[in-house]
Regions:
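N-terminal presequence-like segments and the immediate start of the first folded domain
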Residues: 8, 15-339, 345-399
Length: 399
């Protein structure tokens, strides 16, 4: 039996259609709960983002996994026609837990499994992105394909290898991904929209990841004079301690150049290339009926590339929100359009305070706070998010 304890309707764009809306809901299941964002603009494809969390932290891991999977299946039953297109499991101890996820979750979609402990004291949490009226399959390139209309959305998750160090591992990951994209008649520069790079012991191994990405991007025509790719580079551990870098990614086959725009917010942030790294602050992809906005991992930084408010978690959180909001505004969005948030904390002792700040500002928003050191030690907190907004752009292709 499920109980919906909160339900909010937020009009998106009444000038476009009265049917276009977003909906937030909290659903309590047996031993787990879900915060759900629904985007339904009256066209064929509805989208859902959900964060599912265990409600009893004292349960053994096996029961926590069961609670999350049961909640997911119950949620799916309430969303006619919806299919998962991407999942991410946040684990407290990947070495002992990852295999259980692989065995018990047989969903036919890309599944990211990473050790980034949920900071509410539980052992597992799940973010899932769902869509209706799409066809899903595994391609010969081993990317997961989600098809609707003229687009094929290509997802990959938990890619890793055992090369000698983080630089070699990252270079091999990108080279393999470039070959996978080529099999789909795509390129890294033209089709890849978003990457996630998880770095084991990020304080030690991030430099190698950065060097590899810079080198690969240069060979692919991704430079400060063209564009980079929205990304999160964050601490995260795979079940094998010899894996120093793990990658998830998302590309769109068939996307047109005029659909993709990059976000800069120069009043608040500088170009990442100014301090030697290669990613975009955010990317928006526009369709005839909706806009997707992918905000990269964002911290308390200014437009000179400096850490703002060292050792002050409250002010860093507020500056981070300000930076994210500036990027969203550039895409003609705001926090109401955000479908989910992932928050990364370096110090577990900051959790209760950060949780209270988020609960006050973003009540009911799908959000998970996890333990994951940020790429620069001075940053105590980082967040990423995705926004979905209804638009009316008849010159763009339909989603």
């Amino acid at each position: 039996m499920l109980h919906v304890s909160q339900l909010f309707f937020v009009p998106l764009c009444p000038k476009v259609s009265n049917y276009m809306n977003q909906k937030l809901s909290h659903i309590d299941f047996d031993q787990a709960g879900a915060d759900v964002f629904c985007f339904d603009n009256g066209t064929q494809v509805r989208e859902y983002h959900a964060i599912i969390r265990v409600q009893q932290a004292c349960l053994p891991f096996a029961q926590q996994v069961e609670a999350v999977l049961n909640a997911y299946n119950s949620l799916l039953a309430q969303l006619p026609g919806a299919q998962a297109v991407f999942k991410r499991y946040f684990l407290s101890d990947a070495a002992n837990q990852a295999d259980a996820i692989v065995v018990n979750d047989v969903t036919d979609c890309a599944k990211s499994i990473i050790q980034q402990a949920p900071l509410d004291g539980t052992k597992v949490a799940l973010w899932v992105w769902l869509m209706t009226d799409v066809q899903t399959s595994m391609t010969q390139s081993e990317l997961y394909e989600v098809s609707h209309g003229q687009f094929r959305h290509l997802f990959n998750a938990s890619a890793h290898n055992l090369a000698a160090n983080s630089e070699y591992q990252m270079r091999l990951l990108f080279n393999e991904y470039i070959m996978q994209l080529a099999q789909e008649r795509c390129t890294l520069a033209d089709n890849c929209i978003r990457t996630w790079l998880f770095v084991n012991d990020i304080d030690l191994n991030y430099g190698g990841v950065v060097r590899a990405r810079n080198q690969v991007f240069f060979t692919q025509g991704l430079t400060v004079n063209t564009h980079f790719i929205a990304s999160t580079g964050i601490g995260g551990r795979q079940q094998d301690p010899n894996v120093l870098a793990q990658m998830d990614n998302y590309a769109i086959a068939g996307v047109r150049p005029e659909q993709v725009h990059y976000l800069y917010a120069p009043t608040h942030l500088n170009r990442t290339s100014d301090y030697g790294v290669s990613f975009e602050r955010g990317t928006m992809v526009s369709y005839a009926d909706r806009r997707h906005v992918f905000i990269s991992g964002t911290a308390s930084i200014n437009n000179k590339g400096e850490v703002m408010y060292p050792n002050d978690i409250v002010k860093q959180t507020q500056r981070m929100w300000e930076n994210v909001e500036a990027l969203l505004v550039e895409a003609d969005c705001n926090f109401d359009d955000v479908a989910h948030m992932i928050v990364y904390l370096r110090d577990v002792a900051d959790y209760q305070l950060v949780r209270s700040l988020y609960a006050e500002r973003f009540p009911g928003k799908p959000c998970v706070i996890v333990h994951a050191p940020v790429c620069r030690p001075g940053w105590l907190i980082e967040m990423e998010c995705m926004a979905v907004k209804a638009v009316c752009l008849p010159n763009m292709p339909q989603f």
